[in-house]
Amino acid sequence: MEIPNALPERGAAPAGPVAPAQVQPIVVALIGLPGAGKSVVARALADQLGLRRVCRDTIRHAMFPVCSYSFAEKRAAFRAVMLALEINCLLGESTVIDGVTFSRRRDLVRVDSVIRHYGFTPIPIYLDCPPGVAHGRIASEIEHNQHVARDRTPDLVYEVQARFDTPPPNALVVNANQPAADVCRIVVDAVAGIRRGSPANDAPQGGVA
């Protein structure tokens, strides 16, 4: 994802003490294996920075309550995510995209094609999680019935890993093999800094690869 020059945010109330003139409108794309912790981080960004969370899993469940998790159903839900993203851009609202692994670089290109006309800054963040750790997390989720996507199995981790494109060179890489609270803090601090106009390489470095 290429980071374009950002325009001042239109219509969105800033989160926390940041003045409106200092805030860039942003779109965060969380990249990572199933079980990397994308949803936990997305919720933290929504709660702490006021980003609108657009989740493909939630949208797919609403569109197809009885779902076979086919390619067609997943792509329909992804199209709906892109539509929701564009509406948020029209409203001047920053977004975090959840429920998408972005294992294929072309999906990040789709995000760019939606937001480039609105002057939003794309922030790709790769949650780097060892497959074995992600596998164990999903197994625990299944045991406790904690995820809406019923096709989400431990073996899905290795299926996605096999087709995972290398994240874009400008992605912020965060070590996701650490406590969720630490991962969330690192990402929230980094995104808050970029949103204020700080260069990505000035973001907090604790746990960032």
Which role does the model predict for each range below?
Residues 143-186, 194-197, 201-204, 208:
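Small-molecule kinase domains that catalyze NTP-dependent phosphoryl transfer to phosphate-bearing small molecules
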Residues 58-60, 102-103, 128-133, 179-180:
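Conserved nucleotide-binding/hydrolysis micro-motifs of P-loop NTPases
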Residues 118-138:
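Conserved phosphate-donor/acceptor-positioning beta-strand/loop module used by diverse small-molecule
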Residues 76-118, 122:
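Glycine-rich phosphate-binding loop used to anchor ATP phosphates in small-molecule kinases
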Residues 36, 40-91:
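Conserved substrate/cofactor phosphate-moiety recognition/catalytic segment
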